[in-house]
Amino acid sequence: MSRAPLPLAAHERLIFALDVPGHDEAIAWVDRLGDSVSFYKIGMELLASGEYFHVLDALAKRDKRVFVDLKFFDIPATVAGTIRRLAQWPVSYCTVHGWHAGMLQAAAEANHGDMRLLAVTVLTSMGRPDLAAMGIDREPVDVVVERALAAQAAGIDGVIASGQEAGPIRRATGPDFSIVCPGIRPGGPVGDDQQRTVGVAQAFTDGADAIVVGRPIRQASDPAAAATAIQDEIRAALPQNGN
């Protein structure tokens, strides 16, 4: 059975994508951003450095939340074993591939910690032509909602999906299902590899629990100020009785 979304304070609803090649660069970013960011996503680039869990441990010691974004996809037994081990670490979110019901169920059953599992639906870098090339001639929103419902039925706690689909997902799954949205572009589309993007306010108005932001902060002249500005947008978009 899916668990309720994490009880996130407003400042924890911004997740910074820590896409860097190693430990030293990661910690430099954490120090640079200071109190403007309290939640970090660590993914495949750091894993390849061999310093992944050193970074995870360093973030936890700084009282930061951690999102492990490794998109696990394998036979059910292998994914279950991985989730069982990872649940022993101080991890708030972890991604699993959202296209295999048996694997999703095995992952959910193996998750005995406080970690929330998020199913990957359709990457925000993909549009309908990309799906068609895979033999799926449907609109991304239809595929995403279908995958979200399948993940919920398997006991997964939420999904990671474009903010463009946050509203349809929320209406389909109800309030007790986590929605985390990457591909957020505070200033609008910028012509990078993200196709299905939205702004900060729209994501939260449509039902997102948290957003993932990378390049708009990382490439800003003052990254901490950029993160703080996004935090202000989040607070303005949340209900008045929100955290």
Swiss-Prot record:
Pathway: Pyrimidine metabolism; UMP biosynthesis via de novo pathway; UMP from orotate: step 2/2. One of its GO terms (molecular function) is orotidine-5'-phosphate decarboxylase activity. Catalyzes the decarboxylation of orotidine 5'-monophosphate (OMP) to uridine 5'-monophosphate (UMP). NCBIfam families: PRK00230.1, pyrF. GO terms for cellular component: cytosol. SMART domains: OMPdecase. Homodimer. Belongs to the OMP decarboxylase family. Type 1 subfamily. CDD domains: OMP_decarboxylase_like (cd04725). Coiled coil: none annotated. InterPro entries: Aldolase_TIM (IPR013785), OMPdecase (IPR014732), OMPdecase_AS (IPR018089), OMPdecase_bac (IPR047596), OMPdeCOase_dom (IPR001754), RibuloseP-bd_barrel (IPR011060). Keywords: Decarboxylase, Lyase, Pyrimidine biosynthesis. It holds the Pfam family OMPdecase. It catalyses: orotidine 5'-phosphate + H(+) = UMP + CO2. Its EC number is 4.1.1.23. This is Orotidine 5'-phosphate decarboxylase.
